[in-house]
Amino acid sequence: MHRDYVDKRIPILTDDPGWHGDQLSKAFAARGFEAVFIPLRDCHLELLPDSPGVCLKGFESVLPQGVFVRGVAGGTLQQVIMRLDILHALKMLNVTVYNDGRAIERTVDKAMTSFLLHLQGVPTPSTWVCESRGQAEAIMRRETMARRDLVIKPLFGSQGVGVRRLQQGNPFPVPMAEHVDGVYYLQNYIDAGEGAWHDYRVFVINHRICAAMVRRGNHWINNVAQGGSCEAWIPEPEMASIALAAAKAVDIDYCGVDIIRDRSGKLYVLEVNSIPAWRGLQQVCPQDIAHELVDDFISKLGASDRLSAIV
């Protein structure tokens, strides 16, 4: 049965609405929509005759026009797969999913992000991903002996947690050490200048740059969550082109692209974040980022008929 009315409620999928949820809620209200917050853990599949198969709390009889994904909480492998299954199923039912499950999968996994950037020729640091401690140790010895430091990161992670710099003589993390979890994700350390640590966050919405900032810190990790300061930044053409190419490489509605410039001026993409925070960016940029996100999201609603459930 097709809907015969337009439901103006929009689920924001998150376990913790916080400041970002409040900003999105206000932006939706300004456009005549009502934001409702639903944790993905409260959604489930219900495969019954004459049912679309996906149940969202508060949308048992009619599926929403779209859902705005603001968070996919961590958990066991099975729990995370289940939450992504919900996003995949909603998209198959012609519900607009922003960002969709595939985009989140491509970017939450740093190895796949790096591979896609490499595949599309987007400049990114030399990277190795392996399970073998022997392989990882050999890479570390070779690179550090050549005076190239490494950075080890958790395959899944954000806000700079678990990121470490490896230099010659440093002890190597054991396979099941915290934030390693049996997989070694190694990148060449990009030297932006000792004592002048900085990188850039470029916020991309629908293949255009919405806003950007430079992050400066008293440590080589410049993440705002790690105490970095923010300044508004207007990307030069090369940086803008690289940021847009990175977003295109992972095929995503919106994202935060982290870029670093080395001592010689060369730019590298460090990461692409599919559920980026923008509180720090909003503090230094005049653009209303939540409104721009909501406007883009709304523009993608109604592309096709939505399937509705039968009570």
Walk through the language-model features, giving the residues of each.
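Phosphate-binding site of ATP-dependent enzymes
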Residues: 148, 159-247
